Amino acid sequence: MAKKVQAYVKLQVAAGMANPSPPVGPALGQQGVNIMEFCKAFNAKTDSIEKGLPIPVVITVYADRSFTFVTKTPPAAVLLKKAAGIKSGSGKPNKDKVGKISRAQLQEIAQTKAADMTGADIEAMTRSIEGTARSMGLVVED
């Protein structure tokens, strides 16, 4: 028989840098999960990813206090900022442009995000990423 699910915990944790301090500790501690066990497993799974990149993770906590987790790809905004070489997006994206990004870079980001996005094809996913870039104040160049 399948285990009974007690809770789902959604967090964004820096790749390879999970530790028991907030936000990981309190979120998992409330559910009675072994925090160090999660941190070791998460860090092992994300050691191939660039350290410090925020990785969304969905942790399924079962009634017997065991857990499983699924990692997602980094948020599109983080990948766009990294590709454009900027610290943060524009506060006024329609007026102040903060950087430029090429269509090839957008397609590369869409390929990275393809596993988590529900778009029909890579072109649709690229357009979605392009919209995110524009809302951050990035200029898309052909």
UniProtKB/Swiss-Prot annotation:
Gene Ontology annotations for the cellular component aspect, listed alphabetically: cytoplasm; cytosol; cytosolic large ribosomal subunit
Pfam family of the protein (one): Ribosomal_L11_N
Location of N6,N6,N6-trimethyllysine modifications: 4, 40
Transmembrane segments: none
Signal peptide (from-to): none
InterPro entries named in the record: Ribosomal_uL11, Ribosomal_uL11_bac-typ, Ribosomal_uL11_C, Ribosomal_uL11_C_sf, Ribosomal_uL11_CS, Ribosomal_uL11_N, Ribosomal_uL11_N_sf
GO MF terms, alphabetically ordered: large ribosomal subunit rRNA binding; rRNA binding; structural constituent of ribosome
Modified residues (N,N,N-trimethylalanine): 2
Top-level taxon in the UniProt lineage: Bacteria
Biological process according to GO: cytoplasmic translation; ribosomal large subunit assembly; stringent response; translation; translational termination
Keywords: Methylation, Ribonucleoprotein, Ribosomal protein, RNA-binding, rRNA-binding
Post-translational modification N6-succinyllysine, affected residues: 72, 81
Function: Forms part of the ribosomal stalk which helps the ribosome interact with GTP-bound translation factors.
Similarity-based family: Belongs to the universal ribosomal protein uL11 family.
Quaternary organization: Part of the ribosomal stalk of the 50S ribosomal subunit. Interacts with L10 and the large rRNA to form the base of the stalk. L10 forms an elongated spine to which 2 L12 dimers bind in a sequential fashion forming a pentameric L10(L12)2(L12)2 complex.
Classification via NCBIfam families: L11_bact
PANTHER family: 60S RIBOSOMAL PROTEIN L12, LARGE RIBOSOMAL SUBUNIT PROTEIN UL11M
Protein name from the UniProt record: Large ribosomal subunit protein uL11
Organism this protein belongs to: Escherichia coli (strain K12)
